[in-house]
Amino acid sequence: MNKGWLELESDPGLFTLLVEDFGVKGVQVEEIYDLQSKCQGPVYGFIFLFKWIEERRSRRKVSTLVDDTSVIDDDIVNSMFFAHQLIPNSCATHALLSVLLNCSNVDLGPTLSRMKDFTKGFSPESKGYAIGNAPELAKAHNSHARPEPRHLPEKQNGLSAVRTMEAFHFVSYVPITGRLFELDGLKVYPIDHGPWGEDEEWTDKARRVIMERIGLATAGEPYHDIRFNLMAVVPDRRVKYEARLHVLKGNRQTVLEALQQLIRVTQPELIQTHKSQESQLPEESKPASSKSPFGLEAGRTPAASECTHTDGAEEVAGSCPQTTTHSPPSKSKLVVKPSGSSLNGVPPTPTPIVQRLPAFLDNHNYAKSPMQEEEDLAAGVGRSRVPVRPQQYSDDEEDYEDEEEDVQNTSSAIRYKRKGTGKPGSLSNSSDGQLSVLQPNTINVLTEKLQESQKDLSIPLSIKTSSGAGSPAVAVPTHSQPSPTPSNESTDTASEIGSAFNSPLRSPIRSANPTRPSSPVTSHISKVLFGEDDSLLRVDCIRYNRAVRDLGPVISTGLLHLAEDGVLSPLALTEGGKGSSPSTRSSQGSQGSSSLEEKEVVEVTDSRDKSGLNRSSEPLSGEKYSPKELLALLKCVEAEIANYEACLKEEVEKRKKFKIDDQRRTHNYDEFICTFISMLAQEGMLANLVEQNISVRRRQGVSIGRLHKQRKPDRRKRSRPYKAKRQ
């Protein structure tokens, strides 16, 4: 039992995999690099690594302090999980168990649950024996350790297990019953550091205690902190991101249904007018968009996309008449996947569009310089081109695989099932399962609805009434800005705008990266309604949007509720609660950290009140929003979806790297060495190598040995009187 535990490295990936091997769910370990910064999110406990020799030297200076803070009461000590470390090299497992078994919001699994129930009320020494005699813990512990080298018998006498144990040591800092405790298995009693302040978290006090300990051990030298390491036991971020994505995707569906319900309630006569055309137009649009899962009709596409062909800083010149629904399908410009569809038509002559190469050549963009792209953009050529995503084509085979995955994810993301049964006036097309917002009559109704509500919008628009058709076409020329959301090839809903509120997931490094355009759902709707480069792409306009201002801060923490009259409100308000209710949090499927996650929701609501986002004149309640406000909210939701999907992928990739590093760490290279030596022997090279190494060792060993052996006999000979007579 005393020689079966191996020494573990201080690595967050190793501790994360060790926690999983214990059977614990929803927990991971992260490394803390800065003690000055406040910890973000809930923390279960800290694991502190230090050099035991330095700690023993500094402990003599503060012996009275340790005695004063030690908890001697047996009832208090036995009520918590504090175990003496009786097995050498088991301090890593002791530190993890001291954090996990003293936390009530963690799914411990069967192994640790039995351990906690069995050792309840035991003394620290008995708990230490229970840990040392648990084969499941020892097996999981040793599975992540480096294989120990096989020492020669004469060299093993100089090494002791106690000396190896004292090299580096792990201790835990855990909050228990409102007080900060330091649990060190090599000390007789736990250390009570007292309660933390009312206006601070327990992590703030723990950071101060650790900084004082580091300064005491290093005698105030700030550049010796490399001998210490700090890790935090936190909830699994994958569970959090998956829960947020579940809520965000549900809210995206709710916002899309709100757009549909807005048409059904406010414009029922237009639904009857276009009811006969709804069954005919999808058949006409098949040649233009053969493989596109959300192809728009050719008649309405040029009406909005050709309206905006300016540089983004000038007003729209000329008229943009709204074409009828019987336009030939050869004018279709909105095709999501150019490789799967062919543009066999010629651009209409009245529009000032410069002729380009064919689509299959022009979109490939073999060797076009950035200067040529800017010139084309200034000339208005880029506005008429087929909208494709950046880096659509590449010479790398992995990019093609990512493209196919993105198309599959996009087609699956825009298909959803309606909550209620289809009404007679419903616009949803049940045959193909597409979003009814993208149907032709819905687009016409949203366009007319927007034209009626333009005077109430605070966003400056450039409106030009055409003399031919008599209906105004809206176009807002702005520069397309890159998204502050992280760029990721796996996100099928990456939006062109950022979040409406400060998301904790964004970093300056991610914000500097360019991203792909918005998702097909919002991009097609915004192109038809507001032009290809509408003002919704601007982050400042999104920030002052009414729907985003009201629902943005809670869009990722609580589900939205759509009433029958079109009122959109947070689900917690309909239940009569404040902010997001615990039932909403539990529906996200987060395990082990429900109370901590609820605390985050309260913090989001409080920060919203402090920042002045809540208007004092109007209470936070359900309201009706215009189509443009709903589209802005939809872009906000999709930006958050892209953000969380990127972060989720990062966590998944991080786990893969943890496993790869663990395999490299624990791999036994003895078989490879034996095979290599046998191959050298077969080639006749082993004998020469052995002779060379033996000769070198003899020279070094003999010279050093003679020096030590000659000194002692010389001293003894000089002390004898008969030797002096001979001289």
Curated annotation (Swiss-Prot):
Biased composition (Polar residues): 320-330, 426-435, 478-522
Catalytic activity: Thiol-dependent hydrolysis of ester, thioester, amide, peptide and isopeptide bonds formed by the C-terminal Gly of ubiquitin (a 76-residue protein attached to proteins as an intracellular targeting signal)
EC numbers on record: 3.4.19.12
Region feature (Positively charged C-terminal extension (CTE)): 711-727
Motif annotated as Classical bipartite Nuclear localization signal (NLS), chain positions: 697-720
Residues covered by the UCH catalytic domain: 4-235
Protein family (similarity comment): Belongs to the peptidase C12 family. BAP1 subfamily.
Protein name: Ubiquitin carboxyl-terminal hydrolase BAP1
